[in-house]
Structures are given as C-alpha cells and as structure tokens.
C-alpha cells in the first residue's frame, strides 16, 4: 500500500510539474469596462513568448485587435468570448503582417467575421505568404461600433514598414502592438523587417499625437506600465546612433 501511495504521489508531482511548465494556452485579463487583453503563446528562439491581443465588447458584438499567435487558439478565443460575454465576434483587425497578428485572419473570415488590415499590410502579407484580410484601409480610419469609437493610425515604419496602432479617444486606450515594447524590455525585439533609422521618429510622432494615454498595450511584454512608450523611444534613439 505504501508503494502504491508513493507511486501516486510521484505521478501527481510529475503531472503538476508538466502542467506548470505548459501553462494556459489562452489567458483573458480585464483591462477596464468592456476592454479585455487576451494572451496566447508561441515559441521563439527556444523560449515561450506571450502575444497580447485585445478585444472590446460592444452592443453590436465583439471587436478583436490582432489574432492569436497560437493557431490552436483561434476557436477557443471565440468560444471563451461567447461563454463569458454571450456575444459573437463581428470584426477583427491586424496591426501588421507578421503571423503573431495575422495568423487567424483567414479562419475568422470563414466564420463570417469581417477582417481588416491596411493596404500596405495586405501587400506585405501577399509577398510573404501571410494570411490576408477581406477589407483594406488605404488611410487612417475612424470606426464607430456599438457605442465605441476608435481610430487606426500609421505613425511610420518601425517594427515593420506597415505597423499601425489603435486609439480609443474616450477611454484613452492606446493599443500599440509590436511597435511599442514593454517598459522592462532591454531591446526592440526582432528587427529583420523593421526600419531602425526611422523607429525613434515614428514613436515620437505617436507620442505627440496621443498624449496622456491611460493604458498602453504592448504585444509581447507586461502592459501595465505607462513608461513603455517613453522607454521604447529611448531604446530606438540609442539603436539609431549605432
């Protein structure tokens, strides 16, 4: 009996350790009224990296900003939103062409969800074999959905040539995607498709346009620190001098 109990104890410990190492594949965190940050995960350079997206619950349905990086979480995100809010997703935006933003566009299009990117993002998606949206924006655009107004803004090249941000003026929520890095980050991340020379100028334009945001959402780091934009500018300035 003692050996049996010991075996069960070892099995329980191993199961617990495995569960802890894997962790949740989808995490949803409230930001403010009707605003939620969802996080999925993928592996980059042998390290598990979080990818933050956002969704907003409106009277007309739910709007998603960036799709899950983990391709197994396209449907679980929809299911979680339905279960939590009793709402369906009606629109999905991708803020640049990389797969951590666009991977779910085709899946969501097939589900009847309206998908959006800029023309520039669509060009780069087509060129690089990334998923593409149905509706294309050729300039900064203001949307009003279910009582919420938000706008897309292209401040210039940085992380990629096409990166845009989303701004909610009433709530002062700035969704920066991969353009803005976390306040604790030590570098600007992957720059293989970026523009190092213009990165700092792009971030400064963004800072000048949207003053005093109450929330700044970044793609791959902690989004609770409002120093993220200032810190990103400092890193971009240093990199631009090298």
PLM region descriptions:
Residues 1-22:
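Bacterial Sec-dependent N-terminal signal peptides
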Residues 30-79, 165-178:
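Conserved beta-strand hairpin/beta-sheet module of binuclear metal-dependent hydrolase folds
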């Amino acid at each position: 009996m003692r050996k049996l109990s010991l075996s069960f104890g070892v099995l329980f410990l191993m199961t617990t350790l495995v569960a802890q190492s894997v962790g949740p594949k989808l995490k949803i965190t409230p930001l403010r009224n009707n605003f939620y940050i969802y996080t999925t995960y993928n592996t980059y350079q042998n390290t598990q990296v979080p990818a933050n997206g956002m969704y907003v619950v409106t009277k007309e349905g739910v709007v998603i900003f960036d799709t899950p990086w983990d391709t197994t979480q396209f449907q679980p995100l929809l299911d979680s939103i339905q279960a939590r809010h009793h709402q369906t997703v009606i629109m999905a935006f991708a803020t640049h062409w990389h797969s951590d933003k666009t991977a779910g566009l085709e899946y969501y299009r097939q589900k009847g969800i309206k998908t959006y990117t800029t023309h520039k993002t669509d060009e780069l998606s087509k060129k690089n074999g990334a998923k593409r949206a149905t509706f294309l924006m050729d300039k900064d655009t203001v949307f009003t959905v279910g009582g919420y107004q938000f706008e897309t803004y292209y401040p210039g090249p940085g992380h990629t040539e096409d990166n845009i941000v989303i701004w909610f003026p009433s709530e002062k929520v700035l969704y920066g995607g991969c353009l803005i890095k976390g306040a604790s980050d030590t570098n600007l991340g992957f720059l293989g498709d970026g523009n190092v020379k213009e990165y700092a100028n792009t971030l400064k334009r963004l800072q000048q346009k949207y003053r005093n945001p109450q929330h700044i959402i970044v793609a791959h780091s902690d989004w609770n620190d409002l120093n993220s934009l200032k810190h990103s500018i400092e890193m971009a300035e240093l990199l631009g001098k090298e």
